[in-house]
């Protein structure tokens, strides 16, 4: 069976979901539209990954999943003039 875009989106969205659940547990649901710190958070998670961390201590998600989620949030903000 061919592996399509929807399959990829489904699998990757689970990684994103793990990071979002953690974020909403700590912050308001719309925090990501107000948070000016996406780039700083991306950097922080990249540094942790570079130091060998493969599981975020708070969320249990992979640090690069946090980087990806924050990158998408920042891209959305910039794409919507915020």
Regions of interest found by a model, annotated:
Residues 1-82:
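Intrinsically disordered, low-complexity regulatory regions
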């Amino acid at each position: 069976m061919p592996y399509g875009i929807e399959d990829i989106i489904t699998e990757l969205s689970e990684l994103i979901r793990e990071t979002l659940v953690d974020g909403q547990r700590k912050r308001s649901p719309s925090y990501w539209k107000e948070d000016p710190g996406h780039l700083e958070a991306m950097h922080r998670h990249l540094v942790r990954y570079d130091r060998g961390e493969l599981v975020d201590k708070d969320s249990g998600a992979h640090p690069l999943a946090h980087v990806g989620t924050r990158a998408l949030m920042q891209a959305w903000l910039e794409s919507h003039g915020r």
